[in-house]
Amino acid sequence: MFTQKSFEIFKIEGLEPRMTEIRSEIQPVFSEIGQKLLTELSVKIPNQEFYFHIAQHRRRTANAPENTWSAISTKVRGYKMEAHFQLGIWEDYVFIYLSMIDQPKKQKEYANLLTSLSVEKLLTEDFVISKDHTKAETYPLSAFREAAERLGKVKKSELEIGRVWPKERFNSKEDSIILAEMIETIDQLLPIYQKLMEV
């Protein structure tokens, strides 16, 4: 599980020094939790193959990443082409999102579906949304409909929905509770995810 050291990594200056620590400290945690999330998805959707990806940030040549993530998708490559699950970390929190970023192929179809859903009835009120995967800001669930409409109108718009865990909770005492909450987050998002995969 993540520790306080995981969050301190984002204070390290320089691309290579930070990436070295991300590879040694954060990516093994992604793999550990990711396998448990993969198992959950495989149990809930047994007829679908899922693949686990870890962001490598290979296109970066100068600036160190301000966050990093892993993803679960039905695609062997190109997970951003479709709605997918992300487990990631910023300097202040860890997140699990159902993500539609970087102009997925069915962006307009996703938007049409999402604007028709009453997410407040499907998800608990502690869920949040993100409108840009490159920024740490999150918004309450009440902002979902507007963001979903924007996803259909603005080509470069994005939408992620899920839960965040503030860094203060990662003190080893709550590890099993947090893991259970992560799995439960996937379970709550599954009905929305399955509808998205049908469009």
Swiss-Prot record:
- Which top-level group of life is the source organism from? Bacteria
Gene3D superfamilies for this protein = Protein of unknown function DUF1054 (3.30.930.20)
Q: Which Pfam families match?
A: DUF1054 (PF06335)
- Matching SUPFAM superfamilies: YktB/PF0168-like
In the record, the note on similarity to other proteins reads:
Belongs to the UPF0637 family.
Q: Which protein is depicted?
A: UPF0637 protein YsbB
- Source organism: Lactococcus lactis subsp. lactis (strain IL1403)
Gene name as annotated: ysbB
